[in-house]
Amino acid sequence: MRHPLVMGNWKLNGSRHMVNELVANLRKELAGVTGCAVAIAPPDMYLDLAKHAADGSHIILGAQNVDVNLSGAFTGETSAEMLKDIGAKYIIIGHSERRTYHKESDEFIAKKFAVLKEQGLIPVLCIGETEAENEAGKTEEVCARQIDAVLKTQGAAAFEGAVIAYEPVWAIGTGKSATPAQAQAVHKFIRDHIAKADAKVAEQVIIQYGGSVNASNAAELFTQPDIDGALVGGASLKADAFAVIVKAAEAAKQA
């Protein structure tokens, strides 16, 4: 039985005051929520502060990126060992902003996936097509290629306990969102694609939707059978909006 997971990706936003205030408000808004796992991914600078602010709550600490190296002369990087040491659990990799701005390849992202698994951390593998690829009918081809970078090097078993976040690039931060039916079709394709290698693993892998998820569209998205939660950007910076999304996931999956 898959459990829903809603994760907030704070991106390049935050301050000490903001972290303390947002986490305190999240604790209030999410008190009593038990049917949906909740994670937040602040900038690395604020991971320790967020961890202490969330102590004693059900909020799980995550991070936005990881390096493929565990230590050494790699200026500016953060290793899986460091993230594990500070208490982060869910680690985002392959986000379209990393793929675009930092030219991260499918193969490089697959190496990050492997490093996280080796350290006992949970990869949140972001996949998704650009607007041009979508218009060219290449959505499934792109998603399959991005998944295959892991499947072909680590096997289907690598996805056991992992998370995939389908984020159509054309919907991130644009206000556009795939319709629930469109998102469900891609999520089903992703699950079926993994099932070709291992049906049992495919059935349990959590597949989140990410792409302008907000308080108004969350409930309908979560009624879809293969949408197991959300990776939330802008709305995760507002406790009330984020809480609506979490509660929508909880309600939909308990129905």
UniProtKB/Swiss-Prot annotation:
Keyword Cytoplasm listed? The answer is: yes
UniProt cross-references to Gene3D superfamilies, sorted A to Z: Aldolase class I (3.20.20.70)
Q: SUPFAM superfamilies per the record?
A: Triosephosphate isomerase (TIM)
| The family this protein is said to belong to | Belongs to the triosephosphate isomerase family.
- Indicate the residues that form the catalytic site: 95 (electrophile), 167 (proton acceptor)
Q: Where in the cell is it found?
A: Cytoplasm
The UniProt keywords, alphabetically, are: Cytoplasm, Gluconeogenesis, Glycolysis, Isomerase
Q: Which biological pathway?
A: Carbohydrate biosynthesis; gluconeogenesis; Carbohydrate degradation; glycolysis; D-glyceraldehyde 3-phosphate from glycerone phosphate: step 1/1
Tell me yes or no: is Cell cycle among this UniProt entry's keywords: no
Q: What is the lineage of its organism?
A: Bacteria, Pseudomonadati, Pseudomonadota, Gammaproteobacteria, Enterobacterales
GO aspect biological process, one term: glyceraldehyde-3-phosphate biosynthetic process
Q: Which PROSITE patterns match?
A: TIM_1, TIM_2
* Binding sites annotated in the UniProt record for substrate: 9-11, 173, 212, 233-234
Matching entries from InterPro entries are given as: Aldolase_TIM (IPR013785), TIM_sf (IPR035990), TrioseP_Isoase_bac/euk (IPR022896), Triosephosphate_isomerase (IPR000652), Triosephosphate_isomerase_AS (IPR020861)
Under the subunit heading, UniProt states:
Homodimer.
EC nos: 5.3.1.1
Pfam families from the entry? TIM
Q: Please state what the protein is called.
A: Triosephosphate isomerase
Which reaction is catalysed here?
D-glyceraldehyde 3-phosphate = dihydroxyacetone phosphate
Query: GO CC annotations?
Result: cytosol
- The species this protein belongs to is Enterobacter cloacae
